[in-house]
From Swiss-Prot:
Keywords: Chloroplast, Membrane, Phosphoprotein, Photosynthesis, Photosystem II, Plastid, Thylakoid, Transmembrane, Transmembrane helix. Its main location: plastid. This is Photosystem II reaction center protein H. PSII is composed of 1 copy each of membrane proteins PsbA, PsbB, PsbC, PsbD, PsbE, PsbF, PsbH, PsbI, PsbJ, PsbK, PsbL, PsbM, PsbT, PsbX, PsbY, PsbZ, Psb30/Ycf12, at least 3 peripheral proteins of the oxygen-evolving complex and a large number of cofactors. It forms dimeric complexes.
Amino acid sequence: MATQIIKDANSKGRRTALGDILKPLNSEYGKVAPGWGTTVLMGVFMALFAVFLVIILELYNASVVLDGIPVSWQ
């Protein structure tokens, strides 16, 4: 048998200091905030990230942003 099932109700997981610190972060697991929550904020950050990516793409392609600037690789 590859796995062994232990039916001992007295065995609990090991308690560590790190686990005690991280436990409050996991206490909200499965709970859903009513309404839209932070969805609007997430949308704003996604839009800002999209603008950032467009700016990087334009710089990479030397398009609209760099039209009037001479670029020399020598």
